Amino acid sequence: MSDLWIIILTALAGFLTGVMSGMFGIGGAVISTPAINWLGATPLAAVASTLPSIIPGATSGSLRYRREGLLNKRVILWTALSGVTASVSGALLSGKVPGDGHLLMLLTAGLVAFGAIQLGRKPASNEGVEELAAEGASDAGPHAGIEISAQLATAKPRTQWWRLMIIGIAAGGLSGLLGVGGGLIMVPLFTRWVRLPLKMALGSSLACAGILAIPGTITYAIIGQIDWLYALPLAIGIIPGAHVGSALAIKSPDRTLRLIVSSVLGVIAVAFAIGEIYAIIY
């Protein structure tokens, strides 16, 4: 395949990656990594070359969420603060993981599947109460407003620094080690454990994914594992894609978006698991 076709197809993969990134709050490496591997990049170069594209894509998408007031600065700060160190450590250890990373990817698939199931359940944040109000709480009787206010009071986001730092370490480690943006676990944890409304969880996760990709990108660039023939077209394609994806997410009804996000994460988890089991066996 000529370099021109590689550039065109990689840019297209970048656009699709961006749509998924913006809509689901993830780095999008689940599309870009296998895509550029199929186009000729080595497995290690495919992992390393996705990280540079996550940065502009996450920036494009998170700016769209910011316009709608859907970024939680405290969540982003503490999660990214701990995640940056973990991302560097993960990148440095990427070549030393037993089993070529397959066992770790299986564990990641299990975590994503669990997160998808949790995300698909009834909301654990204010989102659920807001949905109740939107669907006609006035029909529930004269005390409905009091009940909703009480639920809102008890469903405040849990943004303790230690809770966010644990999420950052896990997400950053995966970002550096496997070349994934970390959003695969941040979105479910932000919604279920931190109790952010879904759209705020998506926007905050996307912003964190971009920050966490920076140290990993620098580390991989220094050790010479990034193939810029793939990295640059990916970055060019992902920027408009992320803007489109984030706009679609923002305009979608919360309940519909929750079902879509949980379903997509579930499919990703199953695909990851099947692929890694196949790689281990064969």
Where would I find each of the regions flagged by the language model?
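Juxtamembrane transmembrane-helix termini in multi-pass membrane transport proteins
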Residues: 18, 29-76
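Interfacial segments of multi-pass membrane proteins
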Residues: 32-45, 185-200
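Transmembrane helix-bundle signature of multi-pass membrane transporters/permeases
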Residues: 47-55, 80, 84, 205-210, ...
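Loop-to-transmembrane helix entry
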Residues: 45, 199-203, 225-233
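Juxtamembrane transmembrane-helix boundary motif
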Residues: 1-17, 37-39, 64-171, 192, ...
